[in-house]
A protein has these predicted regions:
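Single conserved hydrophobic/aromatic residue that forms the stacking wall/gate
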Residues: 2-9, 13
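N-terminal amphipathic alpha-helix/helix-capping segment at the start of soluble metabolic enzymes
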Residues: 46-77
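Active-site mouth loops of central-metabolism enzymes
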Residues: 74-89, 115-119, 141-143, 164
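Glycine-enriched alpha-helix->loop->beta-strand junction motifs that scaffold or abut catalytic
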Residues: 100, 152-161, 177-183
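Glycine-rich, proline-tolerant flexible connector loops at the mouths of alpha/beta enzymes
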Residues: 105-123
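Conserved anion-binding
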Residues: 108-112, 166-203
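Alpha-helix-loop-beta-strand connector modules within alpha/beta enzyme cores
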Residues: 119-141, 176-182
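Catalytic beta/alpha-barrel core
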Residues: 121, 138-146, 158-169, 182-193
Length: 203
């Protein structure tokens, strides 16, 4: 809700913006306008509703285990592409924290074009990220590959990353939307901005 100060008086009122999700083509806007509690009725033209300034004009601030993302302060996520061993990830975590990073990222599961390439340390990589978090206090960010991993990620990861390859893995996005863990959604390799925002609607 947004506070509004009346120009005719010193009273401060609250304005509540309500959004209707789904097919609104049959709604009669005039029926809504006649309600004395309604100031204005307008249609959101874009297909994305939740990820839309018309529904929440205020800036979003996401709390990731005490670190705020959004608002006036810049949050920096830094770390290695792949978690390789404890010495590497703890050392990098300490270095990026010293350089001003506020979150630690590292790949435990690595999607590769070739089945013969390094696929990441997987569950062991998650354990090493947790050690680095304990050593530095930095919340951890890592990529999830499928909904089968969700329970472990919800338990251990502070910010779940959805990679470009999974931006349109809609079943995974739906499952993530049912959790209370923040999600970092990367834009797909050839996705438009609208497709990216529509993927965010699932979350």
């Amino acid at each position: 809700s947004t506070p509004i100060k009346s120009s005719a008086a010193s009273d401060v009122y609250k304005r509540q913006i309500l959004g209707v999700i789904g097919d609104t083509s049959a709604l009669d806007m005039n029926m809504l306008k006649v309600n004395e509690c309604v100031d204005k009725v307008m249609r959101v033209q874009e297909p994305f509703k939740r990820a839309n300034r018309s529904f929440h004009p205020e800036d979003s601030v996401i709390d990731v285990s005490g670190v705020k993302i959004g608002g006036r302060k810049l949050a920096v996520i830094a770390g290695p592409c792949s978690v390789e061993n404890e010495k590497q990830i703890v050392g990098v975590a300490k270095s990026v924290k010293l350089a001003g990073a506020t979150l630690l990222r590292g790949g435990a599961f690595k999607p590769r074009t070739s089945p013969y390439s390094f696929q990441g340390l997987k569950e062991e990589g998650l354990d090493l990220l947790k050690i680095a978090r304990k050593e530095t206090g930095l919340p951890i960010v890592t990529e999830i590959m499928s909904a089968r991993m969700l329970e472990r990620f919800v338990e251990d990861v502070d910010l779940i990353q959805v990679g470009a390859r999974n931006m349109q893995n809609f079943e995974l996005l739906k499952e993530l939307g049912r959790t209370n863990v923040p999600v970092l959604l990367k834009r797909g390799l050839s996705a438009t901005i609208e497709e990216w925002l529509m993927a965010a609607e699932y979350i």
